[in-house]
Amino acid sequence: MSEFVDLYDRNRKFLNRVVDRNTYLFQPGEFMMYVLAILENEEGKFLVTQRALDKKWAAGGWEMPGGGAKSKESSLDAIKREVKEETGLDVINGHVVYSYFNEDQKRHDNYFVDIYRFVMDFTEADVKPQESE
């Protein structure tokens, strides 16, 4: 299934190109956007999710909710969608606490990641994990 993403340069400027992230080989200086969420409840507990066993990368591994931004999606819109899809939670009042780049020309794996932090009122019972994630 195709999933289209926007291409950015190293300064995070949109390059006016949209590509299929599953088939496109990223060239030097081309990046896609990923987002991750640190979700902390009011008791100071953090939510991590376990990846499905059939995932191509890190099957069964533990991770923070997140994923790739879709075409025309801002970083903030992407993290809201990803958290909702993966946990059933609606996030508000978050902010970026860290960003980094990965440029791996050997594997054509170029991306930048925005990591958000959200402190919110939720319990384990509120979390509704997505089976496919």
Regions found by a protein language model. Give the residues of each.
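Acidic, metal-coordinating catalytic segment for phosphate/diphosphate chemistry
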Residues: 1-36, 42
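Anionic group-transfer/hydrolysis microenvironments
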Residues: 11, 52, 116
